[in-house]
Amino acid sequence: MDQFLITGRSRIAGEVTISGAKNAALPLLAAMILAETPTTLNNVPSLQDVRTLIKLIAGLGIRIEKQGDTVTCDTSTIENYFAPYELVKTMRASILVLGPLLARFGEAEVSLPGGCAIGSRPVDQHLKAFKAMGAEITVENGYVKARAPEGGRLIGCEFSFDMVTVGGTENVLIAATLAKGTTVLENCAREPEVVDLANMLVAMGAKVSGIGTATLTIEGVDSLQGCEYSVVPDRIETGSYLAGALMTEGDVTTKNTDPALLQPVLQKFEEMGAIITTGDDWIRAQMTGRPKPVDIRTQPHPGFPTDMQAQLMAVCCLAEGTSTISENIFENRYMHVPELKRMGADIQVDGHTAIIRGVDSFNAAPVMATDLRASMSLVMAAAAAEGETLIDRIYHIDRGYENVEEKLRGLGVNIERVNPVTDAAEADSLDD
């Protein structure tokens, strides 16, 4: 299993080009199933989750391929509506194929998802909405079996989500585009990735209003056609690299990004003492001295994003004073705390709140990545630490950060990917 070996005391500085957002690319790929003619999607990141979803879509008999950062999809060859456990178990977003399959073909069988250690993240809101649209839903042996009402078409309805759910909003929005009649969705997620999905659906011929608000109105159409579309830049990748500048008195410019998508995070960076400058498609963070302490509460968009919580906690660990972070989106999202404490951080967790007392520096230590965003917080902490840090289970970071070693090296981080099993085998061969 691969590990990162990072030699610390780096000053993170330079320019880095931001990739397309994984959290936008996945629902966009799923939405391609709706189109009766070929679709082209640009700025698609090369990530494990993307490869998994492409493999799942190809398993339906659909012609789909990725060349560079472009994915093309032709659904005319579809053979089945079945998403097996072997693929879905590794990634929660696989459930997003349920909506388009059900809406376009009237039936679907999709394994219940896996792939995430952050709390329960139930899919009940997806299923509840599909039932409200007339679908017959059964869950048997770990699979969701869905069938549209007689006539093979979902029926528009009024539905209010019991909680703000990004995946639920996306799945139901996708399905509603081909429903008979009008669907009104209340308490929708407003994340930029949801907006990106709605915009692509409109480009395919869908009729969606209220984009970017908590209420979406979708007038169903008979069919959707393919289009050419580009994935929105990854705001979380952007924030992650900028956070590195704050931890190392660095100077980082992120290119091919959108400052408008990251305002709550940039505001906190400025509170912590960073100088933030922006252009149409770039953000620069300059830092001198130690960060100032801040208080952070994760909230649905447009609040502070939960996906930046771990990275900001790592910055707070080096602040000159005491910070507090309240995690209000997911339970069990402080799994990185024990690992940061192994590196010398002073953190106490009480329920949903973490109290972080700043220390002068991190110390190198062997640590383990526990989820995607936690893994990046450990990478940045290791870059700031004194000595060599070995980070285990880095497959998490490969799920969400494209070309991460190359980008970090370009910013001055001394990072190497190592494989203990392979390295040991090579050492044994030298002894023969």
Curated annotation (Swiss-Prot):
Q: What is its EC number?
A: 2.5.1.7
Q: Name one GO molecular function term.
A: UDP-N-acetylglucosamine 1-carboxyvinyltransferase activity
Write down the superkingdom of origin.
Bacteria
Subcellular localization(s) per the UniProt record: Cytoplasm
Q: What class of enzyme is it?
A: transferase
Q: Which residues bind UDP-N-acetyl-alpha-D-glucosamine?
A: 92, 121-125, 307, 329
UniProt record, GO biological process: cell division; cell wall organization; peptidoglycan biosynthetic process; regulation of cell shape; UDP-N-acetylgalactosamine biosynthetic process
Q: Spell out which residues are annotated as carrying 2-(S-cysteinyl)pyruvic acid O-phosphothioketal.
A: 116
Active-site residues, as the UniProt record annotates them = 116
According to UniProt, this protein's pathway is:
Cell wall biogenesis; peptidoglycan biosynthesis
Assigned keywords, A-Z = Cell cycle, Cell division, Cell shape, Cell wall biogenesis/degradation, Cytoplasm, Peptidoglycan synthesis, Pyruvate, Transferase
Name the InterPro entries for this protein.
Answer: Enolpyruvate_Tfrase_dom (IPR001986), Enolpyruvate_Tfrase_sf (IPR036968), MurA_subfamily (IPR050068), RNA3'P_cycl/enolpyr_Trfase_a/b (IPR013792), UDP_GlcNAc_COvinyl_MurA (IPR005750)
Q: Which reaction does it catalyse?
A: phosphoenolpyruvate + UDP-N-acetyl-alpha-D-glucosamine = UDP-N-acetyl-3-O-(1-carboxyvinyl)-alpha-D-glucosamine + phosphate
What GO CC annotations are associated with the protein?
cytoplasm
Q: Where do the annotations place phosphoenolpyruvate binding?
A: 22-23
| Sequence similarity | Belongs to the EPSP synthase family. MurA subfamily.
Known function: Cell wall formation. Adds enolpyruvyl to UDP-N-acetylglucosamine.
> Per its UniProt record, what NCBIfam families does this chain match?
murA, PRK09369.1
The name of this protein is: UDP-N-acetylglucosamine 1-carboxyvinyltransferase
Species name for this entry? Psychrobacter sp. (strain PRwf-1)
